[in-house]
Amino acid sequence: MLIGITMGDPNGVGPEIILKAYRDDKLNQPFIVIGDYDIISYCNELLNYNINIDAMNILDLGILTRNELKIGQISKESGYASIMYVKKAVELALDKKIDAIVTLPVNKEAVRLTYPDFSGHTEFIASLCREKNYTMMLASEKLIVTHVSTHLSLKNAIEYITEDRVYNTIKLTYDTLKRFIKNPKIAVAGLNPHAGENGSFGDEEIKFIRPAVERARRNGIDVEGPISPDVVFLKAYKRQYSGVVCMYHDQGHIPLKLLDFEGGVNITIGLKIIRTSVDHGTAFDIAYKGIASTRSLEEAFKFAVKLVEN
């Protein structure tokens, strides 16, 4: 088994948390860092980690040097470098040279200075895999959620909801959960207050969500919904459900980050490759200060290993 870890934005916490996790022996399977050797080396020197960098498995792409760093800042150069690491990792995964990818955070604004249409890792990696039926899963020990839509405005996210998209998200969620949970049971959150209360506060539940749930049941999936959004996450937290299908980005992100901010893992499901990610950003404000937590990286790495093994 070999896990590829992309370095993330060089101006952020990515290099630091890779080094710290390696130093503390938190990554329990062979891995290769896809990034820039000189940046990793400089971070090691700056933070006095005294790690033998040459003992690490680093695929040096030679894109950025320490002299080009702008620590804690948005820059076109770092945005370009960070997305090149991702492209190389996907290429390696598609060629079966690595078994999974763990991505460290990029800065969307920095990436857009080179790729103006970039909306996030999830969509970018799916496009490289030429996959249209995919979505984002967030997972922690306390809660698992998936999303019908991800990086859309709230207005557009509501318009994006259809029976087919809700059904596909339920199916993707089920197919992923059953790899590591026996007989998973899925909840589907409503969109509107009280899940619309029979059309009193919107009809998306009647027109799209309930028909998708019924179709999933007919196809053998143990699923319930639509369930009022203000209670469904508590029920899942109490283990009444294995995971919750959410209608839009923040509906799923808020409860998971509230319950387990550092332990969350982002997984792109529906791809022909395995990709997990830390569930935090570049943290420019604390970059290269030696204080960034490695917990999300540890959890993302463990989840990638779990998916490879299952």
Regions found by a protein language model. Name each.
Residues L138-Y160, D164-N168:
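Ligand-binding beta-strand-loop-alpha-helix segment within the catalytic cores
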Residues L128-L143, I269-D285:
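Short, flexible loop segments at boundaries between secondary-structure elements
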Residues H121-F124, R130:
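Acidic, PIN/NYN-like endoribonuclease modules and their adjacent C-terminal/linker elements
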Residues M1-H121, E163-M247, Q251-N266, L271-I274, ...:
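Contiguous, glycine/small-aliphatic-enriched amphipathic segments in soluble metabolic enzymes
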